[in-house]
Amino acid sequence: MFKSIREEIQGIIERGPAVRGWLEVVVAYPSFWVMRYHRVAHWLWKRRLRVLARWIMQMARWGTGIEIHPGATIGERFFIDHGMGVVIGEMAEIGDDVTLYHGVTLGGVAPSIDSD
């Protein structure tokens, strides 16, 4: 678990152009915190503790402005730079070493009006 956290911090340092060090990541990067919440919530989701998992992610959303469904599958070293408005749905599958920016929505499965 701690190795994963260290790798995630290192990934943010490498891909975040404004990051000055690990302490700044831990104190000031919402991406780091939303992923801490998501890892716990996803574990709970897989064990069918779904209301608790949803509640944890709602708290994370209020604190970070980033909305991630606890059922979403997210790989290692995931980084959201300027995460306000990011929405990741239940069906999203994100691999390792992925970076997202503000305003991205992933995971919708229902077709929109007038879509092909």
Feature map (PLM): residue ranges:
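Flexible, glycine/small-residue-enriched loop-and-beta-strand segment within the central core
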Residues: K46-D116
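Terminal amphipathic alpha-helical/low-complexity segments used for targeting or macromolecular assembly
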Residues: M1-T64
